């Protein structure tokens, strides 16, 4: 079994490549599997169509503000941008840009509503209704993308998504930047025995030329009572009667699984758990936490699948 910090550890390779094996490229399955994204994008598209069709009819009647056309164009690209980032799983990368563009779009939609809502003409009122829906969806998106991934409302919304992973850290403590700082468990290899200089006296040579203790071959020193290589006296032989004491690990923290996790079959250090399972955790400073399941099974678990209680 590879050690936790070894280069060949499967979990270390997993950390280097990111949490889990996330598929790349554009996929509509990410939108379909995310109820929040599916609902908001669908309502946003419907609101844009209502505003667009009503704007055309209003322009035929005359008196339609030209500013509202720019609002339609701008919101079209905003909705398309949100759709592409969700389908490409790039929300965390572009969430700042998304919030910036949506904030500008909110100004445009509310200004268009103010220009249309007071008109007694039915097409103008229908267009105003479409812009109001666009404003509401924009507010929801700004509140979602403008919040940290560990925010309670965002964690709740993301828990229903099939293809989303949890945030990098679910605790307020800083995350360690070192990928090799993985917690030690009872499965870790026993450290090598250390010897003192007194115990190693028998390995010293009296001649810098020959490699034999007591001098070169045939010398009198070889027949002396000095300890020979591999034949040290009992007083100089390191004792191995004492077995290394097993390190007891305390689990002062409790964490709840917000996602199900299947352990890597190639890494015996990992443990599997189901969503909503309660685990005991020993340390929360790294990206992999030493955890213990209710049945007593111990191992490591990715911190982005857990939230501290």
UniProtKB/Swiss-Prot annotation:
Major localisation: membrane
Pfam family, one: SH3_1
InterPro entries: SH3-like_dom_sf (IPR036028), SH3_domain (IPR001452), Sho1_SH3 (IPR035522)
Key words, A-Z: Cell membrane, Membrane, SH3 domain, Stress response, Transmembrane, Transmembrane helix
Membrane topology: Multi-pass membrane protein
Membrane-crossing residue ranges in chain numbering: 37-57, 67-87, 96-116, 126-146
SH3 domain boundaries: 250-309
Chain positions covered by the region annotation Disordered: 164-190, 205-244
Described function: Plasma membrane osmosensor that activates the high osmolarity glycerol (HOG) MAPK signaling pathway in response to high osmolarity.
Similarity section: Belongs to the SHO1 family.
Subunit structure: Forms homooligomers.
Protein name: High osmolarity signaling protein sho1
Phylogenetic placement of the source organism: Eukaryota, Fungi, Dikarya, Ascomycota, Pezizomycotina
Gene name as annotated: sho1
């Amino acid at each position: 079994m590879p050690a936790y910090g070894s280069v060949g550890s499967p979990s270390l390779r997993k950390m280097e490549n990111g949490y889990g094996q996330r598929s790349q490229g554009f996929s509509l399955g990410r939108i379909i599997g995310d109820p929040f994204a599916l609902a908001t994008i669908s309502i946003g598209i419907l609101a844009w169509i209502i505003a667009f069709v009503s704007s055309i009819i209003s322009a035929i009647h005359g008196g339609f503000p030209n500013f509202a056309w720019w609002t339609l164009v701008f919101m079209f690209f905003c909705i398309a941008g949100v759709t592409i980032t969700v389908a490409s799983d790039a929300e965390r990368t572009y969430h700042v840009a998304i919030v910036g563009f949506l904030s500008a779009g909110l100004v445009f939609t509310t200004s268009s509503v103010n220009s249309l809502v007071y008109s007694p003409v039915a097409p103008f009122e229908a267009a105003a209704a479409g812009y109001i829906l666009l404003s509401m969806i924009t507010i929801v998106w700004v509140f979602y993308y403008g919040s940290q991934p560990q925010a309670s409302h965002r964690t709740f919304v993301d828990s229903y998504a099939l293809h989303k992973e949890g945030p990098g850290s679910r605790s307020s403590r800083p995350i360690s930047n070192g990928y090799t700082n993985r917690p030690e468990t009872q499965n870790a290899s026993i450290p090598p025995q250390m010897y003192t200089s007194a115990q190693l006296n028998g390995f010293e040579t009296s001649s810098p030329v020959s490699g034999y203790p007591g001098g070169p071959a045939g010398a009198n020193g070889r027949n002396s009572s000095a300890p020979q290589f591999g034949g040290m006296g009992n007083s100089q032989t390191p004792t191995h009667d004492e077995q290394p004491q097993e390190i007891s690990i305390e689990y002062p923290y409790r964490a709840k699984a917000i996602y199900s996790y299947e352990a890597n079959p190639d890494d015996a250090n990992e443990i599997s758990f189901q969503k909503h399972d309660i685990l005991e955790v020993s340390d929360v400073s790294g990206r992999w936490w030493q955890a213990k399941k209710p049945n007593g099974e111990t191992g490591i678990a990715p911190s982005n699948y857990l939230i501290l209680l």
